[in-house]
Each structure stands twice: as C-alpha cells, then as structure tokens.
C-alpha cells in the first residue's frame, strides 16, 4: 500500500493501482450508473493529454524528460493498456473533473515508473502540475469528446453509406412492384415498393450530411482556454501548438476556436 494526500486528507492506495486519491474520492462520491467509461473515449482523452504534453515541451514549460515519460504513458493508454485503471462512473459531478483526474493520475504514476520512481512520486511527476499543465477539465474533457466522436463517426458513416447503396439497389429492383400507400392507418393511393426504398435511402443520405456537418464542427476545439476561456495558466504559444500537436496525434485537422470564452461557456 502507498499513502496519498489531497485537501481532504490521506488515503491508502493499493500498490498495483495506477490511479490515486482523487479517483478513489470519485468512486466514493459518485455511485450513479455502475458502468464504466467508453474505451474509445479513454483513448481520445489520452490523445489530448499526449498533444498537451508535446505542446508544453515545445513552449519550454514542461521538462523534456518528464514530458517524454508522459507521452510514453499516454501512448500505452492509447494502445489499450491500463483499461482497468479507469473505474470512475461516466456520470459524476464537475462536468468530467473526476475523469480528467483519473487520467492524470494514471499517466503520472506510469510516468513515474518510466523514470525509475515508484507510483505516488508526485514530486517527480505530478497529476496536476505536469499531466494537467495548461489545461482544465473545461477544455481537455470536451476536446476529448470531440476526438472520440470524430473517431466513432467513421465506421458509422461507412455503415450508413452501405445501407444507402443497398436501399438504392432495392429501389431499382422493386421499381415495378405496386402496392398501396397508406395514410391514417388506411389504404390511400398506389406507390411502388421501389419508391419506398428510394425514400428510405433519401432520408439516410440526409442524415449522413447532418453527421458530416457535425463532425466538421467537432474539429474546432477550445484547448488552451483552461477554466473559463481566458487561457489563464497557459503559455500564449501553447494555444496554437496544442491544436497542431492534436492534429498530428489524431490524424485529423483541428483548429482553435475563434473565441475561447464562447467555445468554453
């Protein structure tokens, strides 16, 4: 067992755990759904943390050896390691604070190990001062949601397009099959089964356009806004650098919102 402290006092943490005291507080405080975080979201949040560490190293604020250890830890989470170290309930107070700190603690403790120190050596790698540097739950968490949504949209759009293609084939195949159209639970006027299939395809195509439009908007992020959008505690160059680094990490173009206060609130 190791002992960790927060403003509420001291708690014992099992040696094998990569999360720490703030995650344990969340487990005690928020018994809401009994479910766990989506694994794609965990990976997306790790991508955000990786991009942030890279940007903070670029500005010179984050020590390079610490930053590289955080990046390695984030890469391991992205690869699917430590999946059992994110036990917090998806629904919790603080609009994602517990999730954010769960990630920060896992990355900090793994980074400590990478640097040759035991878990809980927060004087070496701090969940707050290093893993959450130039960040707030209010920018890191919503950005991770956007990254996750973009990633998940790809198989969804592929599946919907395949469905449209098949419905259009059926529209042609059934073009001469006549049936009654119905209104108010009664027979109304004739329509072909092919016309119905074509209408289904049209509706799904419209849905695809809406999803693509939403995905396009998700590429605008508020990283660097910190708590309320003013960028307090973030280096000026970081705000530009973190969008670039996230683009490189995810493989999608991300852009900083024109007004960070608006984007955050």
Segments (PLM) and residue ranges:
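Conserved, well-structured ligand/cofactor-binding cores
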Residues: 1-265
């Amino acid at each position: 067992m190791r002992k960790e402290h927060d403003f509420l006092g001291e708690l014992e943490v099992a040696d094998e755990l990569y999360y720490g005291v703030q995650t344990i507080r969340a487990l005690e405080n928020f018994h809401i759904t009994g479910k766990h975080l989506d694994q794609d979201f965990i990976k997306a949040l790790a991508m955000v943390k990786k991009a942030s560490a890279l940007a903070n190293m670029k500005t010179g604020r984050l020590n390079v050896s610490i930053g590289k250890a955080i990046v390695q830890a984030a890469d391991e989470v992205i690869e699917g390691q430590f999946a059992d170290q994110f036990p917090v309930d998806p629904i919790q107070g603080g609009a994602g604070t517990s999730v954010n700190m769960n990630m920060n603690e896992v990355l900090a403790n793994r980074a400590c190990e990478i640097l040759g120190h035991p878990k809980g050596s927060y004087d070496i790698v701090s969940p707050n001062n290093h893993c959450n540097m130039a960040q707030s739950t209010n920018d890191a968490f919503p950005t991770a949601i956007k990254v996750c949504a973009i990633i998940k949209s790809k198989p969804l759009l592929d599946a919907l397009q395949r469905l449209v293609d098949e419905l259009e084939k059926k529209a042609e195949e059934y073009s001469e099959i006549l049936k009654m159209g119905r209104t108010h639970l009664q027979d109304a006027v004739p329509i072909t089964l092919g016309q119905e299939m074509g209408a289904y395809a049209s509706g799904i195509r419209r849905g695809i356009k809406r999803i693509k439009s939403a995905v396009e908007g998700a590429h605008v992020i508020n990283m660097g806004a910190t708590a309320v959008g003013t960028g307090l505690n973030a280096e000026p160059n970081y705000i530009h650098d973190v969008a670039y680094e996230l683009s490189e990490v995810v493989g999608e173009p991300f852009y900083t919102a024109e007004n960070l206060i608006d984007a955050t609130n």
